[in-house]
Curated annotation (Swiss-Prot):
Gene3D superfamilies in the cross-refs: Periplasmic binding protein-like II
Family the entry assigns: Belongs to the prokaryotic sulfate-binding protein family.
Organism: Pseudomonas aeruginosa (strain ATCC 15692 / DSM 22644 / CIP 104116 / JCM 14847 / LMG 12228 / 1C / PRS 101 / PAO1)
Gene Ontology BP term (one): sulfate transmembrane transport
Keyword Transit peptide: no
Record's signal peptide: 1-22
Record's keyword terms, sorted: Periplasm, Signal, Transport
Name of the molecule in the record: Thiosulfate-binding protein
GO MF: molecular carrier activity; sulfate binding
Function: Binds thiosulfate specifically and with high affinity. Has no detectable affinity for sulfate.
Length: 332
């Protein structure tokens, strides 16, 4: 455990001042594609906390595939807060050891999701395979890079967006299952998380299209430059609502509840929402969203819960061992 803990952490904190009081350090266990957001958000919160409380606070980060991160917390990684990309991964903390209460999503606004995102296609410059919408991904010879839906919320949103496309265009569940099965036959390798999938596509130059969240497109541009890819918005996307929660059993043991709760609440502040928009996450605050309207194309979103039922049902039907995904997917 000690080895896992030290290997997982990326310090994002300010150095502790000699004379100033220090607050209890916080560990935020998060998913792959949020690295850049929290690199900007954490110093902003540290400045706010110092102004409010007169204390320095160290914030440590752990990133990885969403479900793998949740499993690490269940197995003992002492996260004060968990910031995942879908509710199932926080539900798992409630179901395994009662690390959070079952009603965790009601404790903050917007079902505890401070921003939203869309699923997009990252294609090679010039879009040589003419990939514009979900059916295009099924063309002969098209290789689709997407992370594993069983370990990555990013992958689950891709799966559900493709399924929802069929339903919104008059297909039934059987047609949707067939469509998504064909889509995953186009996948050359299933990485465990969104950042690994980006490396496969951009660095290793595998695949014709990377399916990911729209904020990852901006992260790719910052890391690799804008010259090698284009962003395509498909006609339909599940609305990604990445939730956050205080891990009650950890903060009670560490005495860090006040800091942890303030850290998450500040995500809804004007500064937190502006940082979200700067990182291509759609802010909940409508005034701030309007200020950044040029970077957020209108998308035909559908709600996962209204289309598929609650996330626990989605997980049980589609993504558990032996679920629908296992039925339709076989490695190439």
């Amino acid at each position: 455990m000690k080895r896992l803990f030290s290997a997982s952490l990326l310090a994002a904190g300010l150095a502790l001042g000699g004379a100033a009081h220090a607050a209890q350090p916080l560990l935020n266990v998060s998913y792959d594609v949020m690295r850049d957001f929290y690199k900007e958000y954490n110093p902003a919160f540290q400045k706010y906390w110092k102004a409010e409380k007169g204390e320095n606070i160290t914030i440590q980060m752990s990133h990885g595939g969403s479900s793998k991160q949740a499993r690490s917390v269940i197995d003992g990684l002492p996260a004060d807060v968990i910031t995942m990309n879908q509710a199932t991964d926080i539900d798992a903390l409630a179901d395994n050891g009662g690390l959070v209460p079952k009603d965790w999503a009601t404790r903050l606004p917007n079902n505890s999701a401070p921003f939203t995102s869309a699923t997009v296609f990252i294609v090679r410059k010039g879009n040589p395979k003419a990939l514009k919408d979900w059916p295009d991904l099924l063309k002969d010879g098209v290789q689709v890079v997407v992370p594993n839906p069983k370990t990555s919320g990013n992958g689950r949103y891709t799966y559900l967006s493709a399924w929802g496309y069929v339903l919104k265009n008059g297909g039934d569940e059987n047609k949707a299952k067939e469509f998504v099965g064909k889509l995953f036959k186009q996948v050359p390798v299933l990485d465990t998380g969104g950042r690994a999938a980006t490396t496969t596509f951009m660095q290793n130059q595998i695949g014709d299209v990377l399916v990911t969240f729209e904020n990852e497109a901006e992260m790719i541009a910052r890391e690799f430059g804008r010259g090698g890819f284009e962003v395509v918005y498909p006609s339909v996307s599940a609305e990604a609502e990445p939730p956050v929660a205080v891990v009650d059993k950890v903060v009670e043991k560490k005495g860090s509840r006040a800091q942890a709760e303030a850290y998450l609440k500040y995500l809804w502040s004007d500064e937190g929402q502006t940082i979200a928009a700067n990182n291509y996450l759609r802010p909940r605050n409508p005034e701030i969203l309007a200020k950044f309207a040029d970077r957020f194309p209108k998308v035909d979103f559908f709600s996962v819960e209204k289309t598929f039922g609650d996330w626990r049902s989605v997980q049980k039907t589609h993504f558990i061992d032996g679920g629908v995904f296992d039925q339709i997917y076989s490695p190439n």
